[in-house]
C-alpha cells in the first residue's frame, strides 16, 4: 500500500467514525440500480443525502494527521558507535559505583576499629600515668623504718653522725655498767658462799664480751652508708634486747631473795612455836657453816643462862649471825626442813655502784 492510501481517511475508517467517499457511494448506487437492489443510504450517511466534501470534518486540513514515519531507517555508523560507548560507560560507571560502595563499607569498619583502639589507648595511657604517679608517691613517702633510710650518699660524713656516735657511746657505757653490776653481784654471792675472793670465769668473760661488743669497729669504707646505718640499727636493737634481758634477770633475782628471806623468817617462827626439846640446828644457808655439836651446846648454854626458850642465840638474830661459828665437815643429822630450805642470799656490800638505768 502506498503512503497516500494511509491518510486521514484510513484513520477515520479505522476508528469507525468516518463515512465512505462520495465516489464509492455513487458507484454502489449504480450497482444497486442495475441489480435492482434497494439502496441503504443510512449505512453511509445519517441524513440520507450527499453533502459536499468541503463541509466534511474528516477532510479539514486541521484534522489531518501527518504522514507516518517508516519504522525502519538506515542510521549512520556514528550513532551505533556512540550508543555502544555510552553503554560501556554506563556499565563501567555501575562497576565503579559498586566498588566505591565496597570501599566505603571497608572504611566504615576500619573507622569503628580505629575508634575502639583509640579508646583503649587512652584508657591504658591513663592507667600507666596513675601507676607511675603511685610508684613515685610510694618512693617519695616511704614509711619510717629503723632499717630503711633515704638513699642520700654524700661524700662528706653527715652532721648527725656525731650525735649517733654519742648515743652509741652512752648505750655502751650503760651496758658496761649493767654488766659490771651483774658480774659484781654474782662474784659477791660466790665469794660469800666459798669465802674465796676470786673472780669467776664468767665474770672475766662478760666484760671482755661487752667490750668487744662496745668497741666493735665499723668500716665505713667497706660498705655503703645504708649498710652502715642498717648494721648500727641492728646492733642497737641487740643491745636493747640484752638490757631488757638483764633487767628481767635482776628483777627475778631480787624477788627470789625477798622470797628466801620471808621463808627463812617464817621457818624460824615455826621452830620457835614448836618449842622442841631437842635443839634444832641452825638454818643452813650459803653464809652459815654446817652443824657443830660443840658450838651448838655452847650456844644453848649461853641461851639458857640468858633465860631463852631453847632457841639458839644466832637463830633469832637472822641468818647471818651464824657466820662466826666454826664449820665441821659432817653434820650428825639433817631435818626435812633443812632439806627443803634454800640457801640464804649473801649480804651485799654497802658500797653499791651507781645504777643509771632505774
Swiss-Prot record:
Residues 16-33 have a biased composition (Basic residues). GO terms for cellular component: cytoplasm; nucleus; spindle pole body. Residues 1-43, 135-166, 189-226, 310-358 are annotated as: Disordered. It is found in: Nucleus; Cytoplasm, Cytoskeleton, Microtubule organizing center, Spindle pole body. Its main location: nucleus. Residues 310-321 have a biased composition (Gly residues). Residues 203-212 have a biased composition (Polar residues). Pfam families: Spc42p (PF11544). Residues 82-140, 226-275 form a coiled coil. Transmembrane segments: none annotated. Forms a polymeric layer at the periphery of the spindle pole body (SPB) central plaque which has an essential function during SPB duplication and may facilitate attachment of the SPB to the nuclear membrane. This is Spindle pole body component SPC42. It comes from Lachancea thermotolerans (strain ATCC 56472 / CBS 6340 / NRRL Y-8284). The lineage of its organism: Eukaryota, Fungi, Dikarya, Ascomycota, Saccharomycotina.
Amino acid at each position: 500500500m502506498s503512503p497516500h492510501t494511509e491518510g486521514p481517511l484510513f484513520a477515520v475508517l479505522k476508528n469507525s467514525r468516518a463515512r465512505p467517499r462520495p465516489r464509492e457511494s455513487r458507484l454502489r448506487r449504480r450497482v444497486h440500480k442495475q441489480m435492482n437492489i434497494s439502496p441503504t443510504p443510512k449505512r453511509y450517511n445519517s441524513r440520507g443525502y450527499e453533502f459536499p466534501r468541503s463541509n466534511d470534518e474528516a477532510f479539514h486540513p486541521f484534522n489531518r494527521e501527518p504522514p507516518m514515519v517508516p519504522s525502519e531507517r538506515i542510521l549512520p555508523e556514528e550513532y551505533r558507535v556512540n550508543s555502544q560507548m555510552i553503554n560501556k560507560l554506563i556499565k563501567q560507571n555501575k562497576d565503579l559505583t559498586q566498588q566505591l560502595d565496597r570501599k566505603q563499607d571497608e572504611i566504615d569498619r576500619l573507622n569503628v576499629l580505629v575508634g575502639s583502639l583509640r579508646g583503649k589507648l587512652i584508657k591504658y595511657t591513663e592507667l600507666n600515668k596513675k601507676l607511675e604517679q603511685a610508684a613515685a608517691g610510694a618512693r617519695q613517702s616511704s614509711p619510717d623504718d629503723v632499717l630503711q633510710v633515704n638513699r642520700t650518699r654524700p661524700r662528706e660524713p653527715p652532721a648527725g653522725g656525731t650525735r649517733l656516735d654519742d648515743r652509741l657511746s652512752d648505750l655502751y657505757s650503760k651496758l658496761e655498767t649493767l654488766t659490771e653490776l651483774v658480774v659484781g653481784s654474782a662474784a659477791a654471792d660466790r665469794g660469800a658462799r666459798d669465802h674465796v675472793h676470786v673472780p669467776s670465769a664468767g665474770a672475766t668473760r662478760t666484760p671482755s664480751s661487752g667490750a668487744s661488743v662496745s668497741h666493735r669497729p665499723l668500716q665505713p669504707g667497706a660498705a655503703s652508708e645504708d649498710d652502715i646505718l642498717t648494721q648500727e640499727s641492728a646492733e642497737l636493737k641487740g643491745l636493747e634486747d640484752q638490757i631488757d634481758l638483764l633487767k628481767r634477770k635482776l628483777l627475778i633475782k631480787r624477788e627470789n631473795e625477798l622470797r628466801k628471806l620471808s621463808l627463812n623468817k617464817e621457818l624460824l617462827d615455826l621452830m620457835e612455836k614448836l618449842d622442841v626439846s631437842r635443839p634444832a640446828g641452825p638454818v643452813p644457808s650459803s653464809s652459815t657453816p654446817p652443824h657443830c655439836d660443840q658450838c651448838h651446846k655452847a650456844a644453848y648454854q649461853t641461851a639458857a643462862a640468858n633465860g631463852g626458850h631453847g632457841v639458839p642465840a644466832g637463830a633469832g638474830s637472822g641468818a647471818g649471825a651464824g657466820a662466826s661459828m666454826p664449820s665441821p665437815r659432817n653434820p650428825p643429822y639433817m631435818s626435812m626442813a633443812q632439806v627443803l630450805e634454800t640457801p640464804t642470799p649473801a649480804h651485799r656490800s654497802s658500797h653499791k655502784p651507781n645504777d643509771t638505768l632505774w
